[in-house]
Amino acid sequence: MLELDEKKIRKGKPIGLPYQGSKKKISKKIVEIIKQNFGTEKPVYDIFGGGGAITAECMLNGLEVHYNDLDETVTSMFQKVVSEDRDYLKTLIVSRDEFLKIREKENKTIDDELKLIVNSFGNNRKNYLYSEEFSDLKYNIAIDVVKNHNTFKGYLKTKTYIDAVNNIKDKETLKQLGRIQQLAYIQQLERLQNININNLEITNHDYTHFSYLSDAIIYLDPPYEKAHLRGYSINNFDSKAFYDWAYKMSKKNIVLISSYEISDSRFKCVYEFKTVKSTFAPNKKSGDKTEKLFMVKKGEE
């Protein structure tokens, strides 16, 4: 099993796009595991990079990292957020009506995709954050908080939010008000703007493109078996071929795979994140599954 001294984990919140399937909850631990067990000299290849949580954490820890994802949209969103300023982030909060119009567009811009992420339930880019009954109320509060207080955080203590709460007489409406999730997602994007990506190599290749690698740390977060991921799908992602490739790559590299379980007996669990369970599960039972790291068994390399 790999070691992790949690006292050495970077202080502060994890960063990355608010992206479905993101490793943000465990990105700090994963990168610290890499540092403590394999050092800081080898380059890290984040080949299924998704929302960039592992890549960003590597950068904050001073590791050389290569950010790749087959879905060019997600890497473009990452670059867009980092390259823009705080005022740009304010434009990403949209109403339910605007969200639905954007969703139905055939050709979406990167701005459109970011608006869908920030304003969708579970960042799925399909369903608006709030029910139709309460969407206007919560959207208007979000806009007013940003306009009146120029803040994305601490909004629960702003006069705008407090006044809105005090003006609500209906108990059910008050109960539904809760958090203004758009502001929480914008906070995540704002933290992402603190990194410098001038020297970051970003690509959009299939994982097999990296077959040339040697003496590198290859971090893999592939579509989990019986699951679905943007860019790949359950119909065209061959898990067996992927495991064969990862096994082959482990002969000249350090290969780490994130998953709940791996059916290939050549791999074993080397670390389990016992407090992090599945949020978007491919089936009902997988809600009890925990995130794990896998490597090729010793003697199998």
Predicted regions: what is each one?
Residues 154-156, 162-220, 224-250:
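Acidic, His/Gly-enriched loop-helix segments that form or flank divalent-metal centers
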Residues 30, 44-58, 67-71, 114-128, ...:
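Conserved proline-anchored active-site loop of SAM-dependent methyltransferases
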Residues 40-44, 63-64, 196-200, 251-255:
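Short active-site oxyanion
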Residues 61-198:
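Class I S-adenosyl-L-methionine-dependent methyltransferase module
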Residues 31, 35, 55, 239-247:
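Short amphipathic alpha-helical segments and helix-helix/interface helices
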Residues 1-45, 49, 53-54, 60:
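S-adenosyl-L-methionine
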Residues 5-7, 225-226, 231-301:
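Long, positively charged, glycine-interspersed low-complexity recognition regions
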Residues 58-60, 210-214, 261-270:
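Short loop/helix-cap segments at secondary-structure boundaries that form the rim of catalytic
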